[in-house]
Amino acid sequence: MKKELPTKYDHLAVEKGKYQQWLDKEYFKAGDLTKKPYSIVIPPPNVTGKLHLGHAWDTTMQDMIIRYKRMQGYDALWLPGMDHAGLATQAKVEARLREQGISRYDLGREKLVDKIWEWKEEYADIIRAQWAKLGLSLDYSKERFTFDEGLSDAVREVFVRLYEKGLIYQGEKIINWDPVQRTALSNIEVYHEDIEGHMYYFNYHIVGSDDILVIATTRPETMFADQAIFVHPDDERYKKYVGMKAINPANGDELPIMADSYIDLDFGTAVMKCTPAHDPNDFQLAKKYNLPMPKCMNEDGTMNDLAGKYKGMDRFECREALLKDFEAAGVVDHIETIVHSVGHSERSHAIVEPYLSKQWFVKMKPLAENALKNQETDDRVDFVPERFEKTFSNWMNNIEDWCISRQVWWGHRIPAWYNNETGELYVGREAPKDVENWTQDEDVLDTWFSSALWPFSTMGWPNTEDPMFKRYFPTDTLVTGYDIIFFWVSRMMFQSIEFTGRRPFKNVLIHGLIRDEQGRKMSKSLGNGVDPMDVIDEYGADSLRWFLLNNSSPGADMRYVPAKLKSTWNFINKIWNSARYVLMNIDEDQKLEELDYATLNLADKWILNRLNEVIRSVDENMDKFEFINVGTELYRFIWDDFCSWYIELSKLHLTGDDEAAKKSALNTLVYVLNTIVRLLHPIMPFVSEEIYQAIPHKEESIVISKWPEVNPEYDNDTINDQFAYLIDIIKGVREIRHTYVIKNSIEVDYTITTKQDDLEALLKEIAPYVSKLVNATCVGYNVPTSKNNATEVIKGGNTLNIDLGQYIDMEAEKAKVEKEIKKLEGEIKRGEGMLSNPNFTSKAPAAKVEAEKAKLEDYRSKYAAAKEKLSKMN
C-alpha cells in the first residue's frame, strides 16, 4: 500500500508516541562493543523543580551531538541523571512546609529528609517526562542520581583521600553566612548587586581627652563586636592617639587605638574600627594582633547578648534603632548616601553576612596547580570557544580555599565523627566500630562537591575496573553554560585529575544564557520566563529544537523571539509539503537506490552537487559545534535549492513524456529527500522519523540510520556556474513581468545577448525549464533589440532581452508611471510638511506621529521604485 502523509502538518500528531517507540526498541541504549565509544554525561538538573528554557537549550545541543555520533556509527552513550541540589531543594521543601505552618525544626532531620525524598521522586518523574517531550535520546538504563549509593561511596572516598592528604581541613574563618537558610556559602554561591546604602560617620571619644575620632561604617549593627581601632602609622593626624583608647558609642567599651599599614589613607576618615568576627579583613588584623573575636549576631541574623537592649532584633532593625539612639545622643557626625556592591545568597537572596564560623575547607592551591599543569599536556580539555580557557585559568590562578560544609540536612553527611567523651575527631569511609560512642558531624557537603565527581562517579569509580569506566571515561564532550565554569567545570577538572589522573572530558562546549526579546535575563520577578513545554504544545518539539540550535553561537547569549518559532513551524511545514509532493509522484514499489549519474539531467546533477556541498558543510560545522551554521546551510538548501528550485524544475520531467527523465527525477527526489531528513534528524527527530517512515528507506528507524556521506561521483565543478544561468534567466523574466505588469499567463519571448561562444548549447538545455517555470521562450541569441527592449543582466555580464512592445502599450504605461510619480511627490511634500511642523509633532498623539513617519517612508520607497521603472522604460 502506498504511504501518504496527512494534508496538514500537525506537530502534536507527529510527535505523539514516537519517543516511547524509540525507548521500546532500545535505540538509545549504548553498549555495542564493535563500535568506537563516544560519551556525554548530562549536566544533572537539580530536582528543585521543572526544567526551564535554558535546560531545553543545553540538552538539545547534547542530543544533536549524540544523535549525529550515533548515526555516524559510534557506540554513543548519553548518560542521564539528576542532582540532589542540597540547599536549593531543601529550601523548596521548607517553603512548601511553611505554607502549612510547619518548620524543619518541627519535623526534625529524619522526617524532613523523608519529605525531601518525596519531593525528589515527584520532580524526577516530571523531569523525565520533559526529557521525553523534548525527544532526548538518553540511555535510561544508566541513569544516575548524585545521592545514589555508588555515587555516595565515591563522595566519601574522595573526602577521606583529600583529608588524608591534608587537602581537607577544619578551620575557623570568616565565611559567607546565609541567615535565612542558616548555612555557610562558598564565594561563588554569592552574587553581588549594586544597591543604595549609607556610609555612617560616628564620633568616638578619646579616653582622657576631649578629642574625637570620626569613624565610618556601613554596618553599625556590628559595632557591638568591635575589638580595636586602627590608624595608619604614617598618618600625622592620628599618630598621637596610638596606644590610647576610644569609647565605643554602641556599648561603652574602651577600644585600643592601634597602628597598621593595612589602613587605607583614602577611605573615609582613614580611621577603621576592627570587628574580627564580622569582616574578613578585620579577621586578618585580629589574627595578627591576637585580638578576641566575639560575634554579636546569632545564626538567624538576630542580635545576641552582646547587643544589650537590642538583643533579639533583626540585624537591620537593630541598625535603624541604633541609628535613632545615636542621633539622639549626638554620636552621628554625618551620613553619606552611597551605592555599594552587596553580596546576596544565590538561593535565598538574603544579604549575606560575613561571619566567623568553624567549617570544613578544601585546600585549593595544589589541586588548582595540577589542573593548570594538565592544560599544558596532550590530556588538556579544549574549551569551545577558546576564550573561556582564560576564564578558567584566571580563576584557578586566584583561587581561594573552598568552604564545603553546609548547615542543612539534605545532602551527603560529612564522614567525620567526634568521640562523645574525648572530642577526638575521626574521619573514615565507614562509621567507627563503636559508633554508639561517637557523634557524626551534623553538616553536609556542598552540592558541588558531589557534582564535581559526576563524569567519573557515574562510571563506577572508585572501581577503575568497572566496564563503564574503562570504556566511556574520559567522556568526549561536556555542554554547559558559562555561568557555571567556576561552580562546576573547574571543579570537575581538578577532581578528575586528582583522582583519575586524566581529564574528565576532551572538550567543553560553553553556551550563554537565554534572554527575552529585549535582552533581559529571564526571571520570576520580571515575569518573562518561558516554559519550554508550553512552546512544544504550541509549535512542537522540532520547532523549539530548531529555534534553539539555529539561533545560538558558542559562548554567546540567545534571545527568545516568539515570532521565530512561528517561522520555524512554517519551515517544517514546507519540508512536510515537499515530502507530500514526492510521495504523490512515486509508486508504492519505489526504491531508494544509487543513481545512474550518466542518465541525469542538468537539474538532477545540480541538486546532487549541492547536496554534497551541504553534507561537507554540515559535517565541518557539526564537528566545530557551530550549530547556527548547520541550520543556516540546511535551511538555504531545503527552502531555496530543493523546494523553490529543484522541485519546481522536476515538474518538467514528471509531467513530460520522457519516461527515462521521469524515472531519473523521481529517483533523485527520493534520494535527496531521504538524505535531507537524515541530515535534519539530530535537530528535528520527530518529523524526520515521520517522513523517513513514509518514503523509501533502508533502516527500521531513522534513529539508527546511517549519517549521509558525500558521494564523490556527484561532485561537479562546473554545474553551479551552469545552473546560475538558469536561475538568472528565470529571475530576470520574473523581474520584467513584475516591473511592467505582464501576467504570467501571457507567454513572452526573450533573447540573450552574449559574447561567450560556448554558451548557446547550455542555453538550449535550460530553455525547457525556463518555459515551464516562467512561460517564456528563447527566440534567439545576439539578435538586434527594439527601442522598447527591457533588459536584465545575467551571469557573466550577458543580458536577457524582452521586447515590451509585444505585450504592453509603452507610451500608456509611461504616462501611468509619470502620473504615479507626480502623485507620490505630492504625498511626500505633504508628509514632510507635517513632520517639520512643531505644532503637529509636539501636540499630536505619539502613535499618529509614528504613523505619519511610516507613511512618508513608504511613499519615498514607492517614489524611488517608480523613478527607477521610468528610467528603465526610457
Where are the predicted features?
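Short, polar/flexible loop-turn hinges at active-site or ligand-entry regions and domain interfaces
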Residues: 100-114, 381-382, 533, 554-566
